[in-house]
From Swiss-Prot:
Domain of life the protein comes from: Eukaryota
Name of this chain's protein: Putative uncharacterized protein C7orf78
Gene behind this protein: C7orf78
Listed Basic and acidic residues bias regions: 12-23
Residue ranges of the region described as Disordered: 1-23
Length: 256
């Protein structure tokens, strides 16, 4: 038999060994071994790829766009007839008397604008023929030619606009109407000594029936920068820009 005092260190050693074993077991349970990790990696990585299920396009059902799917789910409304009958039953049966009170103020009636018609009824062939006979035919009698449209919209009988005036070149008409007596005899001058105003006019230009100042001068058309011809079908914006620069430069040079 071993005395108890000698047995004490042996017991302490065994207890310490048990504590270390328990810690190792707990660590193993918490962190799996490398073999387990390798086996899991092999299963996940080296596993052969599973074949995908073949889907037949013709077996896929088409989308349903029926009216039932888009109707709102609400409580079914009660019909108005039973509701009115219930209200009539609840009313107390007694003789009703209507009292018409005189109006204190006579409010002016609001002027209602005429209704704006946006749609017209569709006429049948028979109705269209009747409408043509009533309002579509020309009135009977002698046909009167239509007059030109009156753009002025003034009262009838007013004079027209004056677009011309009586021309008097070199004041001949004015001088002939206001002749003055000539005292004495003046020697005739030669044609060379006469001025341009004193010479006799042998040619008269045709007079315009309208005033030339009222008509504006016409610019050349089409503009050169925007012209489109068969020789310039595919023009760049740069070429048009350079044409405009050239025109402006020539105008500046001429003005100087």
């Amino acid at each position: 038999m071993i005395p108890p005092c000698e047995n004490a260190p042996h017991i302490i050693y065994h207890e310490s060994q048990r504590g270390t074993r328990d810690r190792d077991i707990a660590k193993r349970l918490q962190y799996p071994s490398r073999q387990d990790l390798n086996s899991k990696w092999k299963k996940s990585v080296l596993q052969p790829p599973q074949c995908k299920m073949k889907v037949n396009v013709w077996e896929i059902k088409p989308p349903d766009f029926s009216y039932k799917l888009y109707t709102s789910l609400r409580i079914p409304e009660r019909s108005s007839k039973p509701i009115k009958e219930e209200k009539r039953r609840k009313k107390i049966s007694f003789p009703e008397t209507m009292l018409h009170l005189p109006s204190i103020r006579n409010h002016p009636k609001e002027v209602t604008a005429p209704k704006f018609i946006t749609t017209f009824p569709h006429l049948d062939l028979q109705k269209a023929k009747l409408m043509f006979v009533k309002s579509g035919q020309y009135p009977r009698g002698v046909y009167v030619n239509p007059k030109p449209h009156d753009f002025r919209q003034y009262q009838p009988g007013l004079p027209n606009f004056e677009t011309t005036y009586e021309k008097d070149p070199f004041g001949l008409k004015f001088k002939s109407q206001h002749l003055s007596t000539v005292h004495g005899y003046q020697l005739p001058k030669d044609d060379k000594q006469k001025t341009s105003t004193e010479r006799f006019i042998t040619h008269k230009h045709c007079e315009c029936t309208w005033d030339s100042k009222l008509i504006l001068t016409k610019a050349p058309w089409p503009v050169r920068s925007a012209s489109y011809t068969r020789h310039r079908r595919q023009r760049d914006a740069y070429s048009a820009f350079m044409d405009r620069v050239e025109e402006k430069f020539t105008k500046i040079c001429k003005s100087r």
